[in-house]
Amino acid sequence: MRCDNNYSFSILFSLLLILILDSKVVSLSTSCQSKSVCGNINIPYPFGIEKGCYLNEWYKIECKNATYPFLFKMGMAVVNISLPGDDGYNNPVSYGSIRVKIPITSIGCSRDGKESGSVLNFTDSPFYFGIGNSLVAVGCNSKASLTNINPSKVGCELNCTASKETLPSKSIPFFDKTGCSNNKLPYYSSLCTKNNGEDERSCDGNGCCIAGLLDSEAPQVIGINIESFDHGNSTKLECRVAFLTDDVSPFSNASEPKRLFAKRYATVSLGWVIQTKNLSFVNSLSCKNTKEYDNSTYNIKLVTSCICNNVTISGTDYANCGCSQGYEGNPYLPGGCKDINECLRNSYGQRQNCRESDTCVNLPGTFNCIGNKTRVTMIGVGSAFGILVLVVGIWWLRKFLKKRRMSKRKRKFFKRNGGLLLQQQLNTNKGNVEKTRIFSSRELEKATDNFSESRILGQGGQGTVYKGMLVDGRTVAVKKSKVVDEDKLEEFINEVVILSQINHRHVVKLLGCCLETEVPTLVYEFIPNGNLFQHIHEESDDYTKTWGMRLRIAVDIAGALSYLHSAASSPIYHRDIKSTNILLDEKYRTKVSDFGTSRSVTIDHTHWTTVISGTVGYVDPEYYGSSQYTDKSDVYSFGVVLVELITGEKPVITVSNSQEIRGLADHFRVAMKENRFFEIMDARIRDGCKPEQVMAVANLARRCLNSKGKKRPCMRKVFTDLEKILASQEDSLVNIENDDGADDEEEGMTMINIDDSQTIYVTAPAPSIVASSSSSDVQPLFPHPTWI
């Protein structure tokens, strides 16, 4: 085949199709391949010797003595098995053939003179008589004919004379001698030859005659009959033989019938196909049928390796398959048809020749001859493709190295940000720590728009909080810590561990953390309504202006701190209680947050000894002097928050008369001592509040702000008292009596009378009981710097 330069783009397209060809090849097992030869005869699939190596029993070959193959179900010796296209014609719809030995029919050759022979019957099998077979009769004065086929009269007549010229052949042809012109089958036999009018007088009726078995609809039943006519010239019955064969070249008038009878067999060519009762096998071949192939485009035909055609033999449907033009191999194996490299040889075994100035290029199913100009174009295209592959390779390598570098950095950050310490803490607290999710840095960057400034919710001494949205739709608060040195990583890990231990409705929930970034990051549940400081000290028109809501908030805070101090798995000191760390949700429910400086202590310890940390106005003055932080230090900070709720003032105020800057706690204690409480009471809560109730809370706040920690009530006591105050009925008369003689260093008794039915006494622990606490109160623990 020769193509000009206009097919350049077709070549490129075909080369592309090579890359997308299905590479799946279902091959027989190694055991089947090693047993695919019997003697010197190849046994191709669907035929096979061992079980599992043949399609079904019709194709089973019995190899006797490892030398002689037999068609097991038919009991016939096999001479050769060929696949479609093995003849070299490479016709995609030719049939496979199997040559077998059949008995010779004779009369007058045996001692009893009886006729021998049998009817050959292949009904319901995948085998039929091929169109390359001929009826050969040898002897004198007889007629040989075929039976069980249409037309019914098929045969030839034998006469013996001294001269060939005086007696023409009496052959009665069934088809024309050549077997091509009247063929009605949709395929051609590999043994079909054209009649060129040559003189074929070697077996012409004088002692030998031939009738071609042609133009039949693939007969499966054939018998042979020999009829003698001696015309009374002899009383002795001479030997005569007749048989079907696919090879007539050895026979001539000189052949002796007794010699042929002694041979006892002749070879006949049988065509074989595949029964289509079960289409699963044919469909598994992925071959196109002839109709699909004929309707396909040229490029599709080039990459179609095999074709199957449906035929009907004796009323039964069969299929025969073959490798398409430009392919060779076994069409009955998936992927068994392979492309022929026409630049080395074509389907006829010859090498394709291009001009010396051209280059032969093999293509799927064909080839092309490329001229010099086209070659330059192809070189250019190939070079461009190579450069593209190089660029893509460099890009991929760069991406791989970058990803590897980022992975290495993430591991470095994980270690630097305390990942190993966190794992150790989580393992130490196993069973007490709820499983914390580890977020990837990419996930948090996506959730916060790369930590956009527009997503900032607030900033503090420990870091910046961003609003984010996870892929599952949850809104979260992402706390990105400030850059810290390794000496301060313990505080960050401490916050993760502490929050993992806490499970309380009034404590903000930790969802997870990320340690892959340069600075550590925490992910909390999002609390949408801001913090308590904003609601108290900034102009707003909401429920926090009412005393009932403020009292409810105070109870919630006290409940959370009481849980941290006594109900958690181990006591936890918050160490930074302030109104900005009290968050409110959309229903004004309280959430205590920011545990960066929190500490967890064992049950037999009552304090931490550490470097001073906290927020001005909230820090326990006793903590300043001793550096020992106890649960009563949290009580003091809570007392300041109570005063904020009562007065509406900030924790550090400027006295209007003297312009003196004073802590709110000191200002409150002075006002209470001078009985000026109602002067400092927030005007926004006066309307609608119960003064006795407010006074009861004020006295409780005063006790929380006692300068001596041991005289302050514990958080559980504070929580209980606030719940009782909140539970007082609106029509109840609440009377507060306080020992005015008690100084700031002593604890008085506060009595709250509610109606006539119940009396509640709120009392601090006696000094003698407080003094009897464990000696561990003064045992210093390991100090550590804070993030403040």
From Swiss-Prot:
The modification Phosphotyrosine is found at Y524, Y623. It comes from Arabidopsis thaliana. It is found in: Membrane. Residues 306-369 are annotated as: Atypical EGF-like. GO terms for cellular component: membrane. ATP binds at L457, G458, Q459, G460, G461, Q462, G463, T464, V465, K479. GO terms for molecular function: ATP binding; calcium ion binding; polysaccharide binding; protein serine kinase activity; protein serine/threonine kinase activity. It is an enzyme of class 2 (transferase). Residues 451-726 form the Protein kinase domain. SUPFAM superfamilies: Protein kinase-like (PK-like) (SSF56112). PROSITE patterns: EGF_CA, PROTEIN_KINASE_DOM, PROTEIN_KINASE_ST. GO terms for biological process: cell surface receptor signaling pathway. It catalyses: L-seryl-[protein] + ATP = O-phospho-L-seryl-[protein] + ADP + H(+); L-threonyl-[protein] + ATP = O-phospho-L-threonyl-[protein] + ADP + H(+). Glycans are attached at N65, N80, N121, N159, N233, N253, N278, N295, N310, N372. The chain crosses the membrane at residues 376-396. This is Putative wall-associated receptor kinase-like 11. SMART domains: S_TKc. The active site is at D576 (proton acceptor). The gene is WAKL11. Its EC number is 2.7.11.-. It is a single-pass type I membrane protein. Residues 28-375 are extracellular. Residues 1-27 form the signal peptide.
